[in-house]
C-alpha cells in the first residue's frame, strides 16, 4: 500500500514537472517521456507532416496516468478506513471479553 502511494506521488510529481517545463524535466536520453516526445517532434520536423500527427499525445497519457493514480489513492484510502473500522471492532470485542473474564475472576474470588 505504501508502494502504491509512493508510486502515485512520483507519477504526479513527474507529470507536474513535465507540464510546467518540459526542457527542465530531464536531460536527453534519460527515459523521460516528456523529453522524448519533444525530441521525436524535432526529429520529424523535416519529414511528412502526416507522420508527425501519428505521434501519441502526451497530455492524454498524463491524464490517464493521473486518473489511474487517483483511483489507486482512493482505493488505498478506502482500504485504510475499512482496516481502521475492523481494528476498532476487534479491540471492542477483545475488550468486552476481557471485562467478562475479570468479572468471572472477581466473582470466583469473592
Swiss-Prot record:
Predominant cellular place of this UniProt entry's protein: secreted
Tissue specificity of this protein: Detected in urine (at protein level). Constitutively expressed in eccrine sweat gland cells (at protein level). Secreted into the sweat at a concentration of 1-10 micrograms/ml.
Propeptide: 50-62, 110
Localization per Swiss-Prot or TrEMBL: Secreted
Effect upon mutating residue 100 to A: Loss of anion channel activity
InterPro entries: Dermcidin (IPR028130), Dermcidin/Lacritin (IPR043557)
EC assignment: 3.4.-.-
Gene3D superfamilies found in the cross-reference section: 6.10.140.580
The keyword Manganese is annotated on this UniProt entry: yes
GO annotation terms (biological process): defense response to bacterium; defense response to fungus; killing by host of symbiont cells; proteolysis
Residues annotated as binding Zn(2+) 1: 67, 71, 100, 104
Superkingdom of origin: Eukaryota
Modified-residue entries (N6-acetyllysine), positions: 68
Signal peptide: 1-19
Enzyme class: hydrolase
GO molecular function, one term: peptidase activity
Keywords, alphabetical: Acetylation, Antibiotic, Antimicrobial, Fungicide, Glycoprotein, Hydrolase, Manganese, Membrane, Metal-binding, Protease, Proteoglycan, Secreted, Signal, Transmembrane, Transmembrane helix, Zinc
Region of interest (Disordered), ranges: 24-70
Record-given protein name: Dermcidin
Residues the entry annotates as binding Zn(2+) 2: 86, 90
Amino acid at each position: 500500500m505504501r508502494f502504491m502511494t509512493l508510486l502515485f506521488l512520483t507519477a504526479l510529481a513527474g507529470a507536474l514537472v513535465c507540464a510546467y517545463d518540459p526542457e527542465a524535466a530531464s536531460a536527453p536520453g534519460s527515459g523521460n517521456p516528456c523529453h522524448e516526445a519533444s525530441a521525436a517532434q524535432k526529429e520529424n520536423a523535416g519529414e511528412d507532416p502526416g507522420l508527425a500527427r501519428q505521434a501519441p499525445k502526451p497530455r492524454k497519457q498524463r491524464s490517464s496516468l493521473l486518473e489511474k493514480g487517483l483511483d489507486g489513492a482512493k482505493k488505498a484510502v478506502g482500504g485504510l478506513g475499512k482496516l481502521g473500522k475492523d481494528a476498532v471492532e476487534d479491540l471492542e470485542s477483545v475488550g468486552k471479553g476481557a471485562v467478562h473474564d475479570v468479572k468471572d475472576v472477581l466473582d470466583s474470588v469473592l
